[in-house]
Amino acid sequence: LTCYKGYHDTVVCKP
């Protein structure tokens, strides 16, 4: 349930 901005303006979400 943690989301953050990743590479190349993508969004990375983890539990």
Swiss-Prot record:
One of its GO terms (molecular function) is acetylcholine receptor inhibitor activity. Its main location: secreted. Expressed by the venom gland. It is found in: Secreted. The keyword Secreted applies. Keywords: Acetylcholine receptor inhibiting toxin, Ion channel impairing toxin, Neurotoxin, Postsynaptic neurotoxin, Secreted, Toxin. GO terms for cellular component: extracellular region. Binds with high affinity to muscular (alpha-1/CHRNA1) and neuronal (alpha-7/CHRNA7) nicotinic acetylcholine receptor (nAChR) and hinders acetylcholine binding to the receptor, thereby impairing neuromuscular and neuronal transmission. Belongs to the three-finger toxin family. Short-chain subfamily. Type III alpha-neurotoxin sub-subfamily. This is Short neurotoxin N2.
